[in-house]
A protein has these predicted regions:
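Short hydrophobic/Thr-rich beta-strand motif most characteristic of the beta2 strand and flanking loop
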Residues: 28-38, 46, 98
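Short alpha-helical "recognition helix" segments of helix-turn-helix
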Residues: 181-182
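Two-component/phosphorelay signaling modules centered on CheY-like receiver
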Residues: 14-35
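Acidic phosphotransfer microenvironment of two-component signaling modules
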Residues: 14, 38-42, 117
Length: 182
């Protein structure tokens, strides 16, 4: 099974998003598709529909900052650093922003304007981490194929596979309760 990496580019400057989408050979890097958003609200909408593996995000945006957005995505989805690679793109070489970015699990912090070679190197590293995590997950699935299914009857597993998992995927970026899922 092959991993399809999807990247989400979040910046209130439309030209920045367009430049990133058009100026980088994403396919060569191993990224299948990119999505652009101009604020945190749009970014969340995209994340409801797509399984994003890589986020490149500006800090200063109208409404919610990029740091707040990434922090909330991680909290709501209970994600750790290995699930989604996050990279900050900003004009602010401010230590407190850098520190916060590292605290919320961002893998890098790039200052605009960004050197193409530096950007490519950072993206290659992020894609490699995503691929390694996916390969590790696939190996675990092969080693323990029935680990999750052994405690459920066939009927229960069918409900989980047919209703519960699609519901969770559809509401991935929202806070969910056991009652809502049930």
């Amino acid at each position: 099974m092959e991993m399809e990496i999807k990247a989400l580019l979040v910046d209130d400057e439309e030209q920045c998003v367009k430049t990133l989408q058009d100026g980088i050979d994403w396919k060569v890097l191993g990224v299948a598709e990119t999505f652009g958003a101009y604020n945190a609200v749009q970014a969340r909408e995209i994340m409801k529909e797509e399984m994003i593996s890589l986020i490149l995000c500006d800090i200063e945006m109208p409404g919610e900052s990029g740091l707040e957005f990434i922090s909330s995505v991680r909290e709501k989805a209970d994600l750790n650093d290995e699930n989604i690679e996050c990279i900050i793109l900003t004009c602010y070489p401010d230590y407190k922003f850098m520190r916060k970015a590292m605290q919320i699990g961002c893998s890098d912090y790039l200052i605009k304007p960004i050197d193409t070679d530096e950007m490519t190197a950072v993206l290659e590293k992020a894609v490699e981490k995503i691929q390694k995590k996916f390969q590790k997950d696939e190996k675990e699935k092969k080693l323990f194929p029935d680990a999750m299914k052994t405690s459920f009857s066939e009927g229960q597993q069918n409900i989980i596979d047919g209703k519960v998992i699609p519901y969770i995927q559809e509401h991935f970026s929202e806070t969910l309760t056991v009652t809502e899922i049930a």
